[in-house]
């Protein structure tokens, strides 16, 4: 997909991002159990949320968290959510989301970015592996931790 760009989350784009139609079944993998447990420990000032736009249409959403002092290493530079509209999947939107979050992590002086996902076969593990993430551990809740060196 050509001409992808990021925009900060706004009232208008948030509604569109929340209305993205995913491939059936993907909504089950949007928020790993680990993130559900640690969400309250995040400093919202360190959260980076962007919509991904193609033309004038929101086709994706990415949220990451950057806090080099967080007590959980896998949450210091973490992709929190990558959502891509079903109609835009397989067209580079997810890759763009990860690359954009990686660039933001670098701007914070971080040398890696992590993602946490359910290890279920239908989860996003293959997607992250194709982008260069390697399995680097399992959370206390049984989710897979993947790390990408920047």
Predicted feature residues:
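Conserved beta-strand-loop-alpha-helix junction that forms the acyl-donor binding cleft
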Residues: 114-125
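Acetyl-CoA-dependent GNAT
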Residues: 2-4, 8-80, 85, 104, ...
């Amino acid at each position: 997909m050509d001409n992808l760009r990021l925009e900060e989350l706004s009232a208008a784009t948030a509604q569109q991002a929340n209305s993205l139609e995913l491939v059936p079944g993907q909504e089950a993998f949007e928020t790993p159990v680990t993130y559900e447990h640690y969400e309250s420990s995040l400093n919202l000032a360190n959260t980076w949320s962007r919509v991904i736009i193609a033309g004038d249409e929101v086709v994706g959403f990415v949220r990451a968290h950057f806090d080099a002092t967080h007590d959980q290493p896998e949450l210091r530079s973490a992709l929190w959510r990558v959502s891509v509209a079903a109609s835009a999947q397989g067209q580079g939107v997810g890759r763009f989301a990860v690359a954009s979050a990686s660039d933001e992590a670098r701007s914070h002086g971080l040398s890696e970015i992590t993602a946490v996902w359910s290890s279920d076969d239908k989860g996003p593990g293959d997607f992250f592996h194709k982008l260069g993430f390697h399995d680097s551990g399992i959370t206390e809740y049984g989710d897979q931790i993947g790390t990408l060196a920047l």
